[in-house]
């Protein structure tokens, strides 16, 4: 059978199996086993265990459970609430200070936890009631936190970037740096829209800040600064080449766990057990998807599907930006239905030869891909962040949360357009700090 036709058959079968309710990892294994057995015989099928475990035999993968534990330690404390409170007190005189504080807190907590749902929950519990109390529109209150939570997969340290780096064999440290300026761009766009939307809907009074004494401003800092110093240290170790991502993540997790115990008195063994249990579950889920995606990629390569698609794309007489438009549409649709890790592991091995062949920078593309995945986090039918916000603020209808999030989707699309027009936003800082990339 022609590899391109076989590729369409694989895609259709994968969609059918994943929509049947089976987990992503098991679905990828089932599809891989079916097609290897049908078109390559038992010889390839027997190699599945070797590929499965071989994919996990990677030192860089150790950073995933460590960063997850680091985020869980922070999320198990009041660090998010304290961070929000600190920014609110210090930025109260800034125009639209509260919404700026919320989004700033989302960005910083995302850098500390690396988790979008955790960011939504931690900042939303404090931010949404306070914004409603100060007469911010419900759509702005819910939408800004839902959108701010998505920054967890872009702003370093990001599990999504680690997975992309492993899937495409690119530098994880460089990927982290590539996400910094685009992350700040997104935060700026989110802030601009939030302030404009509040002003447009007549919420002028909501933009006026409260007054805090210097004592009130300084008393909250001792609970926040230690965590921020850990994050700065982690990023310095990564960017400065002091340690590998896995080593840095392990030290960061240990320090955050220690700070949670010392500062927030998290000494209850039950709480620590729940934190370790949930971190382990999330880590195993991601690692299982990575292993299954390795088998899926092996199947695509063994049946010459990946190579045939790349060759076919290369023969098309199409402008490379038109090609990028099609890729963005594909990623956007995939992000509506699948978690970011699954999309990256399934799509990156196929798309990377196409991206390189078209002359695009793989680190710039990582940012584009991640922003597309962010859109999926606040878009139905999955829209995980929407449901997190609905869970912590049930008095706000889900429809209001969704409509309030749509302008932030537009902000992300604008960010993608800006990055396409000015790719240096994603590539300048990595080139400055780590030298020119070799692709």
Question: How would you describe each model-predicted region?
Answer:
Residues 1-439:
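Alpha-helical transmembrane segments of multi-pass membrane transport proteins
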